[in-house]
């Protein structure tokens, strides 16, 4: 089931307004999406990766939202900040802007044939996800690999400009969202 059909099943009527594809550099649907978002009470944006972008042999050098999705998210936020962001992805993504601006983020991963139904049940409150992540999300791709049982370095914690330290100079050492 698509996200659209799942929402229709849970609500019992059509509740999905637009499905636009933004996994490329094409911005032709931006204005239509902004128009729909302007008149909506809540905007549910399903962003992330499609199945062929993840899995064995599908490495990416950038963990941001693919294509122009980040730009679309920011444009929609300008006209209606009441957004629920549903992430559909097969790996952790770097989403610092979304974490700072979007009031609700649901990690859906890439589920199966009942994806739409499962996500709709979460969004409409019929199911409460436990909120545990099977993997850590980095703040920035430069933190990778980042994982829950990473050993500490031998570098000292104290910050002294003449001493090496055990953290990054431009971002916190901790993950954006930790494992578990």
Regions found by a protein language model. Name each.
Residues 2, 6-22, 88-180:
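Secreted, periplasmic, or luminal enzymes acting at the cell surface/secretory milieu
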Residues 3-5, 9-101:
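Hydrophobic helix-and-loop "lid/oligomerization" segment in the mid-to-C-terminal part
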């Amino acid at each position: 089931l698509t996200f659209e059909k799942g929402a229709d099943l849970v609500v019992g009527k059509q509740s999905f307004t637009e499905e636009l594809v933004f996994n490329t550099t094409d911005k032709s649907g931006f204005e239509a999406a902004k128009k729909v978002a302007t008149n909506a009470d809540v905007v549910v944006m399903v962003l992330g990766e499609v199945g062929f972008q993840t899995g064995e042999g599908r490495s990416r050098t950038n963990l941001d939202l693919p294509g122009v999705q980040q730009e679309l998210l920011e444009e929609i936020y300008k006209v209606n900040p009441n957004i629920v962001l549903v992430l559909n992805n097969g790996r952790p993504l770097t989403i610092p802007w979304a974490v700072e601006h979007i009031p609700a983020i649901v990690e859906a991963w890439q589920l199966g044939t009942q994806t739409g139904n499962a996500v709709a049940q979460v969004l409409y409150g019929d199911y409460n996800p436990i909120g545990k992540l099977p993997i850590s999300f980095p703040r920035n791709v430069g933190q990778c690999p980042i994982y829950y049982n990473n050993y500490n370095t031998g570098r000292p914690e104290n910050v002294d400009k003449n001493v090496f330290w055990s953290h990054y100079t431009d971002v916190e050492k901790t993950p954006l969202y930790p494992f578990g």
